[in-house]
Amino acid sequence: MPVQAPQWTDFLSCPICTQTFDETIRKPISLGCGHTVCKMCLNKLHRKACPFDQTTINTDIELLPVNSALLQLVGAQVPEQQPITLCSGVEDTKHYEEAKKCVEELALYLKPLSSARGVGLNSTTQSVLSRPMQRKLVTLVHCQLVEEEGRIRAMRAARSLGERTVTELILQHQNPQQLSSNLWAAVRARGCQFLGPAMQEEALKLVLLALEDGSALSRKVLVLFVVQRLEPRFPQASKTSIGHVVQLLYRASCFKVTKRDEDSSLMQLKEEFRTYEALRREHDSQIVQIAMEAGLRIAPDQWSSLLYGDQSHKSHMQSIIDKLQTPASFAQSVQELTIALQRTGDPANLNRLRPHLELLANIDPSPDAPPPTWEQLENGLVAVRTVVHGLVDYIQNHSKKGADQQQPPQHSKYKTYMCRDMKQRGGCPRGASCTFAHSQEELEKFRKMNKRLVPRRPLSASLGQLNEVGLPSAAILPDEGAVDLPSRKPPALPNGIVSTGNTVTQLIPRGTDPSYDSSLKPGKIDHLSSSAPGSPPDLLESVPKSISALPVNPHSIPPRGPADLPPMPVTKPLQMVPRGSQLYPAQQTDVYYQDPRGAAPPFEPAPYQQGMYYTPPPQCVSRFVRPPPSAPEPAPPYLDHYPPYLQERVVNSQYGTQPQQYPPIYPSHYDGRRVYPAPSYTREEIFRESPIPIEIPPAAVPSYVPESRERYQQIESYYPVAPHPTQIRPSYLREPPYSRLPPPPQPHPSLDELHRRRKEIMAQLEERKVISPPPFAPSPTLPPTFHPEEFLDEDLKVAGKYKGNDYSQYSPWSCDTIGSYIGTKDAKPKDVVAAGSVEMMNVESKGMRDQRLDLQRRAAETSDDDLIPFGDRPTVSRFGAISRTSKTIYQGAGPMQAMAPQGAPTKSINISDYSPYGTHGGWGASPYSPHQNIPSQGHFSERERISMSEVASHGKPLPSAEREQLRLELQQLNHQISQQTQLRGLEAVSNRLVLQREANTLAGQSQPPPPPPPKWPGMISSEQLSLELHQVEREIGKRTRELSMENQCSLDMKSKLNTSKQAENGQPEPQNKVPAEDLTLTFSDVPNGSALTQENISLLSNKTSSLNLSEDPEGGGDNNDSQRSGVTPSSAP
């Protein structure tokens, strides 16, 4: 029975007794069949036949010469000249001796593999020959030259060695970088395609799945089947690419094709290819054949990497290559080598090998070939010795790749463990190709190299994780290259931004939700650049969990994070706005950062930072500018970035204490907590935000809406009037459907004029801007560090100028009322009742704030996102631009108009909760023109009070006289606006006019002036709006008359009535919204400017029902207007 042949690497031991050959008892005797056995085992054979292939041994064993080549490899003494009796003459003997000498010399290249038991193979003794060359050389060494069959085998082995040598030389002259590209180019040139190891394997398995049962399918059906199955895992799969894979199999003749008349042919898989192994082998064979046709010579290990992505299929590929070899392939390879040498100049003079190679190529490899003569044998072996020597010489002296050319690419485990074969057996059959270490020195060398590579890997991994979280790696990695991971110590903010400390996440959104708002997800900060000053990387790096509680929830009400977030110790508001910081892409989403205001000096004017991008005060802050995500505009850096609102709240609304760290960081979305430069909201939005009429500069810049804005980028033409630092602060790009994007202001010219008047009034108020702390006694007002001078017209510039950190921290929505209004996402008119009485607002500021939050949430939940002029999807969080809880820390934007969002009833709110917004209500209007900006309560400067006059509803009322005058003016403006609104209502008879009015009213909601017609929330149809407009117009006529009568009433009464009326109006149908005028009046009347909570609103509505009736002409008209504008008036208690 045949014995299993040993591994070719065990050529130094007897395959029968497994003992190493020696020169005494176990002399190696080679048989004509190519097997070598020790003489002792041969003598014990029962039959004179090879124990492995049963070939008969015709020659006397004693006459067979010892294989001296193997003896020299085992270190044994080679016997001197052995008598050869099998040679017919002296000449033959001479040829024999020369041939044997050639074999012995070639065998020396096997010395590194010479011992399976201890000679050892290490990095210095590894053979320069490749594994295929060594294997072919072993075959040659085992040939018995005295036997005729042995000589035939020796010639074939010599030819094979010569052919492999040519291939090796061609490989040495190839550019490995171009090898794969040349291969796939050749494959594509034949209408085929390789999709990569994993995808190609799946595609082939699916083809087999469809056809293994013998079914016949058309090519189209087969391709569709494969594509549909591949799509879940490989979305890039296409009919074209899969069709090319099928073409590859078709080219390989794997299908039995049945043609049909006037119909597509049917393809049936041939029976021999209905297993994956057979199909894959034919597939691989076809690719190898294409490569050979293209003149490419690729090593088996390279094939394994290309087709399988590993090194475990080298033998498989080698067998395919061998089968594809033809007698003509050798001569063709010689020609290709000649061409390659001409291209390189042949520095090693390899052309001298050409005659020898041609001689070897002319050897007939067929088994039926006649046996060679002794002379032919000698010539053939001399030629193969010459070409192998030439190859070794070239590899050692001229090759750039050297002996390691076949080594697979290094990876993390490459040669970091000892080779098992080397340890156990003292030698490794894989030689230089082994991926394990063969010596301790080699092991230590690669382990050290691996350690150097490790740090980079974790970084990329951490970046990948951050990306998964939604943080762009650019935002994560600042120019400094520091990666700020939550676990890592937050590095100082780049570009002069001071990190507030690990406890406060600088990038925390103002939203209450600790989790990043999906819209705010860092991943959405696509435009943030690592180099952007105040780039999120550092800011993001340490996001305290407490801060995380201040997640960038665009919709969520600002978290009452102050408690959660320790006040940031930032003296200066962090400058989160990069100079050209991509952090604040034009499409900046509101990046919510903690408002570490408490730590920062309250209202410290934020000087424009060098890196900060400041837009002219009148212009909308770049933050609102929404450049294409690809080119995020650096938001105007507010020196006082919105101080983390958390700190504001933590500081008990001591604005001064909380630096405005992130104003620029907060992008387009208006957060109740951030102060935005008077955003160019649709006036409706502004009206909604605060009853106080606010001049809203026409939106010159696309709204700042972050990602959600991105959808509306072109629509976003709104820019805050003054780029308040807070307004500017880019926030994480949000896509919150409710991102607070004021609808583009579309007020009629008259309304614009009214708004301008309001702005003037607000400017005056701001000049006086000593806003007594909002009635929210409970919350200590942070002393505003605002400089009254700076707050005036500079408000537009406030973002950069406001030294009062609080202002910079204030966001238009920063005020409690406003915050809640904003929190309600423009607190919907329904939800928000215009605060008519300042006292009520003050008294119930907290409770109302909570109610406002509820209202805001509801409003946000309502499908009417009136503020969003861009479409059904609201840009502002459904909970309000600033929906926040009393604890939410709001960073006051720079001196921004402090206005109570009309929907936000002012409650006695802990300013600490809204620390940035002393008068929450008034500040909520901060989105308005900076003139209306209101310093934090308790810290309001006179200017603040002035702004509070209008913001009176937002903050403490100005001195009664001034207040009343301002109120009168505001009321007049409101009446005018309402009248204009009525006129518009008449014009709105047509649906288009109605829609425009609605947009205006929406805009008006955000500001006292009649809002431009913003897009109505998708909830309200144009027909409904038109009907409402007609009704409103009728009511307006009535109320106008009533108002004229009521105008006679004292201004105080009017303000109170307006407030109460707004409170009631805030209750009206969502469609009915308080006109901007009413809102402004109510806000001016309402000291805190904060919207009443629903309960307070209900109470106010009940109490003021009679007042409303009397003031309905005015308030009702306004309400109707506001309804048209889509804003619900909010009443301040």
UniProtKB/Swiss-Prot annotation:
A zinc finger (RING-type) spans 14-54. It comes from Homo sapiens (Human). Disulfide bonds: none annotated. The record marks 510, 579 as: Cleavage. It is linked to Immune dysregulation and systemic hyperinflammation syndrome: An autosomal recessive disorder characterized by systemic hyperinflammation in the absence of an infectious agent or autoimmune trigger. Features include lymphadenopathy, hepatosplenomegaly, recurrent fever, and laboratory evidence of immune dysregulation with abnormal immune cell populations and increased serum levels of inflammatory cytokines. Its EC number is 2.3.2.27. Proteolytically cleaved after Arg-510 and Arg-579 by MALT1 in activated CD4(+) T cells; cleavage at Arg-510 and Arg-579 is critical for promoting RC3H1 degradation in response to T-cell receptor (TCR) stimulation, and hence is necessary for prolonging the stability of a set of mRNAs controlling Th17 cell differentiation. The RING-type zinc finger is required for proper localization to stress granules, but not to P-bodies. The ROQ region is required for CDE RNA-binding. Has 2 separate RNA-binding sites, one for CDE RNA and the other for dsRNA, both sites are important for mRNA decay. ADE RNA-binding involves an extended binding surface on the ROQ region with a number of additional residues compared with the CDE RNA. It may also be involved in localization to stress granules. Zn(2+) 2 binds at residues 33, 35, 50, 53. The modification Phosphoserine is found at residues 462, 531, 535, 863, 1110. GO terms for biological process: 3'-UTR-mediated mRNA destabilization; B cell homeostasis; cellular response to interleukin-1; lymph node development; negative regulation of activated T cell proliferation; negative regulation of B cell proliferation; negative regulation of germinal center formation; negative regulation of T-helper 17 cell differentiation. Post-transcriptional repressor of mRNAs containing a conserved stem loop motif, called constitutive decay element (CDE), which is often located in the 3'-UTR, as in HMGXB3, ICOS, IER3, NFKBID, NFKBIZ, PPP1R10, TNF, TNFRSF4 and in many more mRNAs. Cleaves translationally inactive mRNAs harboring a stem-loop (SL), often located in their 3'-UTRs, during the early phase of inflammation in a helicase UPF1-independent manner. Binds to CDE and promotes mRNA deadenylation and degradation. This process does not involve miRNAs. The gene is RC3H1. Residues 505-542, 1000-1019, 1058-1078, 1094-1133 are annotated as: Disordered. The lineage of its organism: Eukaryota, Metazoa, Chordata, Craniata, Vertebrata. This is Roquin-1. The keyword Nucleotide-binding does not apply. It catalyses: S-ubiquitinyl-[E2 ubiquitin-conjugating enzyme]-L-cysteine + [acceptor protein]-L-lysine = [E2 ubiquitin-conjugating enzyme]-L-cysteine + N(6)-ubiquitinyl-[acceptor protein]-L-lysine. Able to homodimerize. Interacts with DDX6 and EDC4. Interacts with CCR4-NOT deadenylase complex. Interacts with RC3H1; the interaction is RNA independent.
